[in-house]
Amino acid sequence: MKSTLYSLALLIALAALTLSCCKGNKTDQSTMDNSNIPAPVMIDDTTVNGLTVYYPQFSSIDLVCGTMPSQQDTNVVFCAEAAFTHELLDEFDHSNIDGDHVSGGKRYKGAKCKDNSGAFAWFGDTTWEFVNGEYSELLDSVAAAGGMGFGQAIIIHDGESIRPLWREGTNRYRALCEKDGRLCIVDSRDEVTYERFVALLEAFAPTHALYMDMGAGWNHSWWRNSDGKVHEIHPVAEKSRYCTNWITFYK
């Protein structure tokens, strides 16, 4: 009898563990204490390890496609290029964004991209998720929830660095991160090798980090301070007109 009860208890425990693993690791913003973050963006200028960290205080996120959010839209507190753009085209089409993506609660088919090793998704409420690996089911779920999502190269997942070091040359790199249960955008302060940027991120120790598109033109981005003043992180450049998508945080 004891053996039977023990076996039953073991099966129940294993089933619970399996269900827990299948759910993924969503983060719920509503459980976080944001009292120490002034609206709408806090900049943590971490000069010591060569990073600038932007913490948007937001109520919603979307992947805006086709036209960059206007600086006159006072509801926007931060926006930056997210997924890769496949080709330099004069006209916008969702198929020119690398990887399937969700914008405004609708899933779109994008171009194939072997570098998209993970994804980020916002579920349209207070929860988000970073994924390492296949993310098609995640996009279906987030579209059904009215959220947003896009694929990119995962750098760090669950605190572990993901290899290979696939970028060449020096650049001012950027990543979307989760740090201490909060979303932030992390930029290298100077031009560095990708390997150096990963090392800086490892020292910053986020739970998750997902690459964001950068380079001259692609790095044009901006944020709004608590007085409503817009600050451009990088100016408009020749190739900025080819940008296709922007992760956008709304107050």
Regions found by a protein language model. Give the residues of each.
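Conserved, well-ordered active-site substructure
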Residues: 92-108, 167, 178, 182-191, ...
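Zymogen propeptides
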Residues: 23-112, 186-187
